[in-house]
């Protein structure tokens, strides 16, 4: 519950920067990961785990692509 609280506040108050959006989405994924680990079955948990890894990698690719092709683009500073 704490990860969801932190991620929602980070998403609301720091939405101008791409890196903070990606971090807040990772915290949301972590809170869902912890919540669903008790609820879902084994195969659905494996599917959700694969989805979370793929979304994390795609988020990093988007951030690196923005920094490479568009300059800083509010990614870091």
Swiss-Prot record:
It is found in: Mitochondrion membrane. It is a multi-pass membrane protein. GO terms for cellular component: mitochondrial membrane; respiratory chain complex I. Its EC number is 7.1.1.2. The keyword Transmembrane helix applies. It is an enzyme of class 7 (translocase). Core subunit of the mitochondrial membrane respiratory chain NADH dehydrogenase (Complex I) that is believed to belong to the minimal assembly required for catalysis. Complex I functions in the transfer of electrons from NADH to the respiratory chain. The immediate electron acceptor for the enzyme is believed to be ubiquinone. This is NADH-ubiquinone oxidoreductase chain 4L. It comes from Caenorhabditis elegans. The lineage of its organism: Eukaryota, Metazoa, Ecdysozoa, Nematoda, Chromadorea.
């Amino acid at each position: 519950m704490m990860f969801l609280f932190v991620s929602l506040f980070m998403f609301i108050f720091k939405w101008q920067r791409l890196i903070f959006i990606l971090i807040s989405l990772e915290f949301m994924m972590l809170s869902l990961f912890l919540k669903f680990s008790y609820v879902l079955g084994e195969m659905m948990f494996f599917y959700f785990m694969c989805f979370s890894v793929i979304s994390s990698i795609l988020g990093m690719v988007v951030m690196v692509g923005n920094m490479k092709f568009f300059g800083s683009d509010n990614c870091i500073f």
